[in-house]
């Protein structure tokens, strides 16, 4: 069984990105466990392990989406107030479901195929970038060689001039 690489490296995430991912994960876990009610994060290891074992795979569908900047979904109301938690979570879930069905209809592919297609497109884009950088590198090498020859010629001319001045 081969390990699949992550879409990002651990060193590339800033602290605010990690915090946003953590908050998103807590929201998903709390909405799945309590069917939309807001709870505080689990306090002990037993509760944490229970929350991970009771997850519905559909609640983790956000993991298959393309990584990008985290969306800000905070409102001015307190996050655990009954009015805001139930209505905003329901609205967010509805919007996410509509967005996913639109994406699937537009692409005409399953999420796994769309993910593979994105990976293939990214790989092709990376190959194009490598080719462009190789061309630029070669051009810069030629420019360095030209400038080196020019500096050597100028240096020789300067030395000749200084020698001729001392002889005269």
From Swiss-Prot:
Domain of life: Eukaryota
Region feature N-terminal, mapped onto this chain: 10-26
Coiled coil (residue ranges): none
Cellular-component GO terms for this entry: CHOP-ATF3 complex; CHOP-ATF4 complex; CHOP-C/EBP complex; cytoplasm; nucleus
Residues in bZIP domain copies: 98-161
Modified residues (Phosphoserine): 14-15, 30-31, 78, 81
Region (Leucine-zipper), start-end ranges: 133-147
One of the GO BP terms on file: positive regulation of intrinsic apoptotic signaling pathway
PTM: Ubiquitinated, leading to its degradation by the proteasome.
Renumbered residue ranges of the record's region Interaction with TRIB3: 10-18
Family affiliation: Belongs to the bZIP family.
Function: Multifunctional transcription factor in ER stress response. Plays an essential role in the response to a wide variety of cell stresses and induces cell cycle arrest and apoptosis in response to ER stress. Plays a dual role both as an inhibitor of CCAAT/enhancer-binding protein (C/EBP) function and as an activator of other genes. Acts as a dominant-negative regulator of C/EBP-induced transcription: dimerizes with members of the C/EBP family, impairs their association with C/EBP binding sites in the promoter regions, and inhibits the expression of C/EBP regulated genes.
Quaternary structure, from the entry: Heterodimer. Interacts with TCF7L2/TCF4, EP300/P300, HDAC1, HDAC5 and HDAC6. Interacts with TRIB3 which blocks its association with EP300/P300. Interacts with FOXO3, CEBPB and ATF4.
Name this polypeptide is given: DNA damage-inducible transcript 3 protein
Source species of the chain: Bos taurus (Bovine)
Name of the coding gene: DDIT3
């Amino acid at each position: 069984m081969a390990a699949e690489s992550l879409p990002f490296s651990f060193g590339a995430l800033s602290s605010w990105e990690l915090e946003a991912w953590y908050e998103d994960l807590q929201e998903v876990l709390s909405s799945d466990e309590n069917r939309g009610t807001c709870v505080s994060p689990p306090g002990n290891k037993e509760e944490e392990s229970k929350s991970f074992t009771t997850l519905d795979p559909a609640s983790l569908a956000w993991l298959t989406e393309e990584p990008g900047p985290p969306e800000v979904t905070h409102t001015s109301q307190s996050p655990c107030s009954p009015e805001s938690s139930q209505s905003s979570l329901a609205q967010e879930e509805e919007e996410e479901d509509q967005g996913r069905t639109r994406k699937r209809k537009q692409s005409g592919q399953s999420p796994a195929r769309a993910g593979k297609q994105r990976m293939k497109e990214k790989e092709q884009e990376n190959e194009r970038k490598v080719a462009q950088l190789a061309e630029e590198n070669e051009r810069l090498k030629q420019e360095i060689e030209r400038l080196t020859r020019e500096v050597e010629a100028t240096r020789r001319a300067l030395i000749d001039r200084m020698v001729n001045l001392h002889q005269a």
